[in-house]
Amino acid sequence: MNLSCVTIQAGLQRPVRLLHLSDTHLCFADNRDCQRKRDLAASRIRYFSGSNETLESYLDEAVAFARQHDCLIVHTGDLIDFVSHLNLEKLHERFALADTFFAVGNHEYSLFVGEAKEDNAYKMQSFHHVQDAAPNPIECASRQVGGLNLVAFDNGYYRFSTAHLDFLKAELQRGLPTILLMHTPIHTENLARHMRDVRKEPCAYLCGSPSHWLDTYSEQRREQQTPDQPTLDFIDFATHQPLVRAVLAGHLHFQFADLITPTLPQFVAGAGFHNQATLVNVI
């Protein structure tokens, strides 16, 4: 396992260890699925290590590490690459093997990957199937461990909702230091520049990007990633709360650490399909 380590200051009486995973992209399909889906599985796995067995061995390694080092696994989405009978079964089975808290990604809802506009109507075609397989509520959820509050949101389509904001406000009433989990990272200038200048990406694939970035995107990507008012309201509130100590995200397939505000770090996990993981020591 390619392991990196970060420390988050939260003022806990005892340290809490999290093993942060993201973007595994399992690509299973079987005879219960149509031929198109089976062909998709064979095609997509080539991008993600070339073998589902290899991906599962990476997950086995992470579970063994978490058990050995008393870690709660936190996974920030895209455990599976698309919806299939076997992928959903694998999602359920994998999260049952170790104590896990989950923030859903956009690929958990993908029917054929890129074949349609990803919006709420598209998501709802598979939402209940994904929810049935997941270890916790996927729209928003919380988990308290060792005096720390973990709060997860579904922002896989680059949006937050008023319901997300209401949920966060209620969770902060607990008065506990809080870490936010989400699939899509919140925009920072450093991360956006890295995506453009180092990764040579045509857009930043971030949540809450401002207009001076969006104006350079293609029409499709600009529409996809332009934040609506509930998204802006959520980010403004969440990033200015003293109890919110860090953001954990995924989506980009490489590790990146930056500050959203002078006091709020964001840690983007590397790709699970590259056997990357982050040990998060919360103290």
What are these regions (language model features)?
Residues 26, 80-81, 108, 149, ...:
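Short active-site segment of divalent metal-dependent hydrolases/proteases
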Residues 61-72, 149, 158-258:
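His/acidic metal-ligating clusters that form di-metal
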Residues 18-20, 75, 102-103, 180, ...:
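Residue-level marker for buried hydrophobic side chains located in beta-strands
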Residues 1-86:
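N-terminal active-site segment of His-dependent metallophosphoesterases
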Residues 6-10, 84-179, 202-206, 257-281:
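Extended active-site neighborhood of metal-dependent phosphoesterases/phosphodiesterases
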